[in-house]
């Protein structure tokens, strides 16, 4: 069993068709967990893990509909940070707002991935402004509003940063499990590992 300092539990928040499964697919391929010649069953990414530089990163899918509010909240209580994936043309949509609001209320840090920057109608600067406005509207604290941004084309496995930088962001932004109490909880030992 790994010590908790070597584990990060990360949730991916995205609206339908913004590239969540594709992003995870390429993360798995690039870390050697998943080979390019394998096929991935649709929605198989509910929970996956990659290991990078000795740190196990558990990737958790989040349902995006308000009907699953309880499930979203339970899932987010297990993670140490979130990847917010937003389409470079469509921007943040209602499904994104709902889940991100839950994550911010729990005090979770975020890494923002603006995906599909290769679309002809992509408008990454405007979308990033909309993301900042969304964070402010949802009451993000000063640490949450200082999120790192990655511009990506997930289906091509490309990002504006080197892969090693991309993999370091979730590890660097999220604290180890149990290192930060959730609002209303007292500090103490609390480790959760998703296997």
PLM region spans:
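P-loop NTPase catalytic nucleotide-binding module
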Residues: 1-16, 88-195
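P-loop NTPase switch module centered on the Walker A-proximal segment
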Residues: 1-86, 99-100, 126, 130
């Amino acid at each position: 069993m790994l010590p908790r300092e070597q584990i990060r539990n990360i949730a991916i928040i995205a609206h339908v068709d913004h590239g969540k499964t594709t992003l995870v697919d390429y993360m798995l391929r690039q870390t050697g967990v998943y080979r390019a010649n394998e096929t991935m069953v649709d929605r198989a990414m509910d929970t996956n893990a990659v290991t990078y530089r000795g740190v196990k990163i558990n990737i958790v899918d989040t349902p995006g509909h308000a009907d699953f509010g309880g499930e979203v909240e339970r899932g987010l209580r297990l993670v140490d940070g979130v990847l917010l994936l937003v389409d470079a043309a469509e921007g943040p949509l209602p499904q994104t707002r709902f889940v991100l609001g839950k994550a911010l209320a729990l005090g979770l840090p975020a890494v923002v991935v603006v995906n599909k920057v290769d679309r002809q109608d992509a408008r990454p600067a405007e979308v990033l402004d909309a993301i900042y406005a969304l964070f402010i509207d949802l009451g993000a604290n000063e640490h949450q509003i200082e999120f790192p941004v990655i511009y990506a084309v997930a289906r091509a496995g490309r990002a504006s940063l080197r892969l090693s930088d991309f993999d370091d962001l979730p590890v660097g932004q999220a604290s180890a499990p149990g290192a930060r109490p959730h609002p209303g909880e007292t500090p103490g030992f609390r480790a959760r590992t998703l296997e």
